[in-house]
Amino acid sequence: PSKALLKSAELFNKIQHSEDLGITVKGVDYDFSKIIGRSRNVAGTMAKGIGFLFKKNKVDHLIGTGTINVPGMVEITAGKDKGQILSTERILIASGCKPRRLPDLEVDGERVMTSRQALEMKKQPKSIVIVGAGAIGAEFAYFLNAFGTKVTLVEMLDHVLPVEDHETAAVVEKSFKQEGIDCRVSTAVENIKVNAKSVKMDLVK
């Protein structure tokens, strides 16, 4: 779904800069809720498509929580297919990523949200601090900035996209700064205070 958001942001950004190509476009606007809704629809369509391919190629697709109690055996302990036990020679764990939460900070899905919750945000924020400048954080920074949100991107390590090489990261960081994203590297977030209207914090080098 994040790639669908990026597609909308990329198109809007190109229209905003169309005069560079000699094309004048007036009266362009966007509907944030529709952009979010489209990304969810795309995700749903893809999931159905994958399900069809599984069935077509005779791949068993079980839904639930897999638990490995003994080597070579997986038990579905919760979910639709609870109770099924699979015996196999090899087990490949590809469970995806889980957002890491900051200690002593309650995630309410409104003022403080995980990346998964951000995929379903109902209202565009006027400003946002994104903690973590990895691929997911960078995607959200680009998306929200393209539609006018004031974005501060914070990373504890010394460059954005910390798992990528420095040269690639430097190009991305330079581009972000040119687009107006406030990139804070080698920076930690401390003293976070959340109230009904805003979130305040200290950014410490």
Language-model regions: role of each:
Residues 1-124, 152, 157-161, 165-168, ...:
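Glycine-rich flavin
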Residues 137-138:
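N-terminal Rossmann-fold NAD(P) dinucleotide-binding loop
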Residues 141-146:
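Gly/Ala-rich phosphate-binding loop of Rossmann-like dinucleotide-binding domains
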Residues 148-150:
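Conserved beta-loop-beta element that borders a ligand/cofactor-binding pocket
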Residues 131-134, 164:
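Glycine-rich Rossmann-fold phosphate-binding loop(s) that bind the pyrophosphate
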Residues 129-130, 153:
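Hydrophobic Val/Ile/Leu positions in short beta-strands of Rossmann-like dinucleotide-binding domains
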